[in-house]
Amino acid sequence: MSALWSAWGADAFTEQVEKATSEMLPVGSEDIALNLEICDQVRAKQVPAKQAMQVLKRRLSHKNPNVVLLALGLTDICIKNGGDHFLQQVASREFMDNLLSVLRNPAGVNNDVKNKALGLIQNWSQIAQAKPAHMSYITDIYQQLKSDDQFDFPPLDPNAAAVAAALVETLTAPEWVDGDVCMRCRTAFTTFNRKHHCRNCGNVFCQQCSSHNMALSWFGIGQDVRVCDGCYARKGPPKNALKLSRSKSASSSSPSTSSSKHVPSGRGASSSSSHHRSATLGAKSKRSARQKEEDDIALAIKLSLEASAETAPQRSRPTSFATPSQPSAATLSAHKPPNGRVLEGTDADNDPDLAAAIAASLRDWAPPQPSAPFGLNDTAGPAPTSATDASQSANSHLPLPPSLDLAPQDVDNILTFSQTVQAQQAHNQRTGMVGAPLPASVQAMYEKASSARPRMARNLEEGHRRHNVLVSMHDKLTEAVHLYDRLLDAQMTRPAQAYAPHGYAQATYPAASHQGYGYGYQPSIPLHESAYAAQQAGPSSLYLQTPQSHAGPLSDYSGTPAPWLPQQQQQLQPQPQTQPPQYEQPPYQPTQQPYAPHAAQPQYARDQPPPQHSAQQQQQQQQQQQQQQQQQQQQKQQQKQQQKQQQQQHLNPQYQQYASPNPVSNHANAVYADPNQALSPTSTVANTAQYAAYDYSGATIDHASHTQANSVAHTTAPAYAQTNGAASMSSAEPLASQPPDTLSVRTQGIMGGAPSNVSTVVPADKSQVINDGKGNESISTSHLPEDASISSRNGWSAVPTPALTEGALERTATGTDVQHQRQQQSYHQQQAPVKADTSYLPLFPVAPHPDNGFGPDRNAAEATSPMASPYTNAPSSAGMWQNPAGTGVTSASANANANANANADAAATESPLIEF
């Protein structure tokens, strides 16, 4: 009854052991079939060897002598048929000390139990002599009991030792070999392409290469388990199975032996048994595949972190491929309690011991860390005093990677098999025996050569990994070298102008094409200063002024010539600026002046060119300036000659009386000559009388003032606004504020299209006529009377001051006015020119235009549009008093007198074109 209660809740293996050693069995009767089945489970590693040893140890401590006798017999059968891994557990201190305590029981021991136990210990000691690495502790117990007089051993059989050694030679399932790729098709393992181990050879394969199942009776495995394609075709154990089991048992016995000498009883062989694959006949797992996969990954990560934390200071590579896992992982897994197992043939989904073994194997075969960081981390001690000591210390800290060469024996086996197969194939071809079976020796050579395949695969993978590491390091080094070369090139090619001389900030100069001359270094003038340069001279700035009159902020700087200053002024003032021929001056030649730096004006000092370039640049600039001036003068003379030829060819004899009186002209549009000769159609000789320039020193410019760069206030012309045909000024100052003796001339379209209101002082006798009129309001807009409308398109427009009256409407002739306009034209052509007093007014030449009636296209132009007639509002460059909207420009008084006489309307149809 106690046996039933003790077996409650036990696993299947414990139940089978209790059934084989039951109290109900008669004395001397054993269930051999059940004992062999239990032995096969131990041999096939379906049950851990340590767990089987503990179950038998409990049965040996039973009070019933019959149970103890049956347990001793079952233990002897398992030792002879269980394999070397079970021998290690039986020879441990935990099992042998318990058996010794049974023999030395103070209460006494049964004689049958005592005699059978002493006989088994004597036989096991003889087996231990053949396997000293596995069963050395049994030999010690035998010698201890033999020296004691209380125990009498039976006589020793001389042949028993050889027989026992032969009986314990048992084939067992090989240890599993781990890898990242399939050892048959070389396919990498992933989350979905899982790895599978062959139970016959222990290698790792993919699903396609290990899809067969069969029973392995030579290993004591009666169930169908997974095998690879090669083992399934062989239908037998591998040829090196016994050798592998011996070598692995020998290599794994060393930690157990060492631990048996220093570890207390019961913990001797725990390090080696934790790595063995085990399974039971229990129920299948109920968890899903996804849950099992997540648990496996979590367990592997946990074990890897723990192992890396413990073995970080002394991490090193194994010296041989047959070295087992690290003892640290084995110790961790040894303390785990036994749990339920799964059937043989699954991939250890619920086996934590196997998962720990796999994690340890992965850690063993992990790629080594880079040598440089590893060596730097380890050099925490004092630095060596000499270079030799430093190299020795570095070599001692850096572990050498294992060699990738195969063992000489493996190389010999592979070459022997290859040469034998080639010779056999050549012999078959010569004799014509194609397809003849190979001899047995060739099959043995194939098995020997195949044993080196896993090691060769691992070496190949390690070689590829090292090659990839070296390639990546080479790429990084190449990239670093390229970056370093770029930095050196950038430093060598950096321009010298990037550094500011004398500690001042480097000024930014515009391109040479902006200045008109191809000099590489020319200080630029701000636009607001250049624009103000033409207005600084006062009302006489309508003509080209000499540069000496300009007193700008750049007058202090004269270190380098600036031939581009007039060109900038001409670009800002696109209207023609000409003088009479007798007053035409040569181009401005700036003189070289010594440059004296001003301490109070550092903003001009930074515009100074570098000292090493100033002297050469000045000489080059002077030479280039002289050459360019000569070229410009030649081009101007050629253009003038071409223009004169064109004018003489296309001049219609009908309009000879309106031609320019002076045939020699230095201007593209017209010439400045005597206005008296301009009114005479027969005069062809220009008067050489000297006329004063249009300059009134007392003239004022009514502009809105603003601050210039040199803190000098100047004015800006106010804008005109035309609304409903009336001219009005947007200036804040009323017209009534102007002095009574001023003449206001509207110059819209001049100075680059900017409107301007220039007030000039008029002599008293001339201004009296104006003051007697409508007052200051009439001065805002000036109109010409009918008698002053006779003008020439290529001559001069005489505008007498007394004729300035309150202007009539200026409008475009449309509709019925076209006929009246043509009549006026024919009338004016027949009239003799009227000479007026124009000694005090400026003279405005009319520029020729291809559409204003001159040239061979006059008839076509008048036929196309009457507005293109020379006596109508033809296009001009200045466009003064033009009305594009078609409405006349009138003053306030002209708007009041809307019904003017017909003569005023007729005169308004022709607007005199005045161009500066």
Curated annotation (Swiss-Prot):
Signal peptide: none annotated. This is Vacuolar protein sorting-associated protein 27. Residues 274-289 have a biased composition (Basic residues). Component of the ESCRT-0 complex which is the sorting receptor for ubiquitinated cargo proteins at the multivesicular body (MVB) and recruits ESCRT-I to the MVB outer membrane. The FYVE domain is involved in the binding to phosphatidylinositol 3-phosphate (PtdIns(3)P) which is required for the association to endosomal membranes. Both IUM domains are necessary for efficient binding to ubiquitin. One of its GO terms (biological process) is intracellular protein transport. Zn(2+) 1 binds at residues 182, 185, 206, 209. Residues 247-273, 561-576, 590-605 have a biased composition (Low complexity). Belongs to the VPS27 family. InterPro entries: ENTH_VHS, HGS/VPS27, UIM_dom, VHS_dom, Znf_FYVE, Znf_FYVE-rel, Znf_FYVE_PHD, Znf_RING/FYVE/PHD. Residues 311-331, 385-396, 650-668, 777-795, 866-890 have a biased composition (Polar residues). It is a peripheral membrane protein. The keyword Zinc-finger applies. GO terms for molecular function: phosphatidylinositol binding; ubiquitin binding; zinc ion binding. Keywords: Endosome, Membrane, Metal-binding, Repeat, Zinc, Zinc-finger. One of its GO terms (cellular component) is early endosome. Component of the ESCRT-0 complex composed of HSE1 and VPS27. Residues 577-589 have a biased composition (Pro residues). It comes from the Eukaryota. Residues 292-311, 349-368 form the UIM domain. It is found in: Endosome membrane. SUPFAM superfamilies: ENTH/VHS domain, FYVE/PHD zinc finger.
